[in-house]
Amino acid sequence: MERINFIFGIHNHQPLGNFGWVFEEAYNRSYRPFMEILEEFPEMKVNVHFSGPLLEWIEENKPDYLDLLRSLIKRGQLEIVVAGFYEPVLAAIPKEDRLVQIEMLKDYARKLGYDAKGVWLTERVWQPELVKSLREAGIEYVVVDDYHFMSAGLSKEELFWPYYTEDGGEVITVFPIDEKLRYLIPFRPVKKTIEYLESLTSDDPSKVAVFHDDGEKFGVWPGTYEWVYEKGWLREFFDAITSNEKINLMTYSEYLSKFTPRGLVYLPIASYFEMSEWSLPAKQAKLFVEFVEQLKEEGKFEKYRVFVRGGIWKNFFFKYPESNFMHKRMLMVSKAVRDNPEARKYILKAQCNDAYWHGVFGGIYLPHLRRTVWENIIKAQRYLKPENKILDVDFDGRAEIMVENDGFIATIKPHYGGSIFELSSKRKAVNYNDVLPRRWEHYHEVPEATKPEKESEEGIASIHELGKQIPEEIRRELAYDWQLRAILQDHFIKPEETLDNYRLVKYHELGDFVNQPYEYEMIENGVKLWREGGVYAEEKIPARVEKKIELTEDGFIAKYRVLLEKPYKALFGVEINLAVHSVMEKPEEFEAKEFEVNDPYGIGKVRIELDKAAKVWKFPIKTLSQSEAGWDFIQQGVSYTMLFPIEKELEFTVRFREL
């Protein structure tokens, strides 16, 4: 009889720093009911990966669930597949950290009664040199997408077998995940999956179809709880798979104990197909979507898709400078604390991938996820002796100035407005400037491709198929920044300008200081910066801005001196962007010599003091991003701009105090 081997796997993960209620809801809607139903079908076998943050939460909150996993492992129904413990993208962390991360999760698997030999590759981000790290960690097989193999030139028909791949003389087995199964399971009726699997049957006993995808598809994604559990999809699926003589259910290890991989392939740097769209800069991503849609309309996509390639995962460091800066700070501290087990514990947590990128989930746009990464970078850096240094932190070829004392770390970019791009408090373990600017994303112009499938299609929509229209109340408030957001950004503005024009980026910037280079010299506890620039009115008026930034025990002091070569009436504004995330602010204009900011579940309380009264413009920085639930209009921080009238010369002092 012709048969097909079938490997069924799920990947369960919640990011470090996610809200407790999210863990709880995902547990109740997916992780628990899935395993309870699995227990009812002793013939069903599942390959499962649980991430470290999720296992830690389960151990603390639902310890009985671990007993259920142990019993399923004992019965031979579960094969544990590991990854880095804190779910890092392995390609984006140092080799030394990869080995520790994998060993930590292997240790946890042993506690559950399983000696894991396989890796679920986080976000399936593959690069060839991972082979050496994986083999050194005792890993025998790794799971990626069929897209990786197609990118290497293999046809779809060749992707129903695992292959070997090699790097530097080390060899590992690679299983391809079938993309069609990812879109069928669990969104279409069970019979569709069975029909597809039966269409793959063969007299080759080694032919195998692999499904391995997010466990959250089974109850957490929109509409799936009702479909998978209440309408009985999962029970029907397990019953159909285990009772079908043409389908031979296996785990990865069982397959490898019976069959040898088909041959040797070399896979390029890749992830799954959707990632090649998301990781492109927005303009290119829009073109990519248009190109894919054009190929589909012409009926050519399936034939030529192997040659359709977009960006790679590491492109996110190019697309989002804030992600790149956070990542390079993590690498910097990782190298410095490698021999300190206590500090290293924190840096391994800071490698959790979710906050570094953005696709169909919130990712980098979720402030609480970024905050957790920064918290752990700062906690690790506490173990290092404070020192002032000039170095290229983010590897862009231009030096940053890092000023540090026992309480604070300030990273200043002289080449970008002489502004503070990191102000980290060691006491609170927060980065006060963890603020994303408002960026245009390619999906803000909703392409035809995102229209949901016709309602007559059986089943439910995957989150990749949900149609989305931007609500009008959000569209009215939508604005895109021309500059990155930092602390001590220097503006020249017309005296008659309004807060609304300023916050919606409809105002005219008169100066050339916000994103231009400043010269600098180091001083004790800080740095002196200056720029000879201009105010551009009817003609260019030469202007000089000097600022002396000194770290204090509770923050910093900035002493300003502003000079215009000839009289011109304007407003000089100093903008401070703060990572206020838990208090929803509204635009406001007020006069003040000092004011407090209170963000109880975020950065806490701080005070900004001036030596002379100023007009203050305050507004929330809100970004529009997509998520599995639709649109997120998220406050990334709050901008505070202190405005002083200037005609020829101006001197003032700004003090930032942590309370």
Swiss-Prot record:
GO biological process: carbohydrate metabolic process
Active-site residues, Swiss-Prot/TrEMBL: E123 (nucleophile), D214 (proton donor)
Xref: InterPro entries: A-amylase/a-glucTrfase_C (IPR015179), A-amylase/a-glucTrfase_central (IPR015178), Gal_mutarotase_sf_dom (IPR011013), GH-type_carb-bd (IPR014718), GH57_Enzymes (IPR052046), Glyco_hydro/deAcase_b/a-brl (IPR011330), Glyco_hydro_57/38_cen_sf (IPR028995), Glyco_hydro_57_N (IPR004300)
Induction data: Expressed constitutively.
Keyword list, A-Z: Carbohydrate metabolism, Glycosyltransferase, Transferase
Coiled coil: none
Temperature dependence: Optimum temperature is 85-100 degrees Celsius.
Keyword Nucleotide-binding among record annotations: no
GO molecular function, one term: carbohydrate binding
Catalytic activity as recorded in UniProt: Transfers a segment of a (1->4)-alpha-D-glucan to a new position in an acceptor, which may be glucose or a (1->4)-alpha-D-glucan
Regulation of protein activity: Inhibited by p-chloromercuribenzoic acid, monoiodoacetic acid, mercury and nickel ions.
Pfam families: AmyA-A_glucT_m (PF09094), AmyA-gluTrfs_C (PF09095), Glyco_hydro_57 (PF03065)
EC top class, as a word: transferase
E.C. number(s) listed in UniProt: 2.4.1.25
Family: Belongs to the glycosyl hydrolase 57 family.
Subunit structure: homodimer.
Function noted in UniProt: Catalyzes the transglycosylation of maltooligosaccharides, yielding maltooligosaccharides of various lengths and glucose. Maltose and glucose can be used as acceptors in the transfer reaction.
Protein's UniProt name: 4-alpha-glucanotransferase
Gene: jgt
